[in-house]
Amino acid sequence: MNNPYEKALDGLSIEDPVKSFFDWCIDRENIRVKREKGIPAPWTDDPIFQKGRFLNTFREDDRGSKAVQRFCAPLKDSLPDLVHALFFARWCNKDTTLDLLDPSILKQTKNLKEFLLNSVSQPWCSAVYPVVSMHWEGKVYERFEACTDLLPALIDFLVKCIKASDGNVVTATNMINSTFGMSNDFPIFMAVIGISWFDPET
């Protein structure tokens, strides 16, 4: 995959990286606020911000995270159902798909698979971060099968790990991935930390 920003900082000398980082955060957040108020572009005089695409300062302001919140909110009063929705949402991670799905379909595996393959624009999932294959009971599951066929059977295991972690997202992620064996555990981390949006005490 070609990364247009791969060499963007080559040769750049930053005198105070910490100050520069927080200045960037402030500038980027100001852009988001102006956009949300409907102020027309450009939202900054900085030519780099005008020409480039950048993440929001706060992840919860990203379109994908907002879609995850909307999708999971109806299930916030049931930890098992919330965990199911969060793990599916992070395996999918595509706002346009999540916005079309009713979370009640997660327990209807056949209907869910049919919907993902035939009722949403393809691809049904996002490649913003890799969701690699995972292991369960001696079998390897790729992304689609993992979040449709397998996920309903994993809920008790996931909830048990999350409760046993005593509120530590890194501990929960490591406990889960010690079984899943994923070479990139970021989707697990994102699903687990999403619980705090709805139930900060878990």
Regions from the PLM with identified roles:
Residues 166-202:
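Catalytic DNA-binding helix-loop module of base-excision-repair DNA glycosylases/AP lyases
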Residues 119-181:
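Helix-hairpin-helix/helix-loop-helix acidic hairpins
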Residues 1-139, 197-198:
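Structure-specific DNA junction-binding interface
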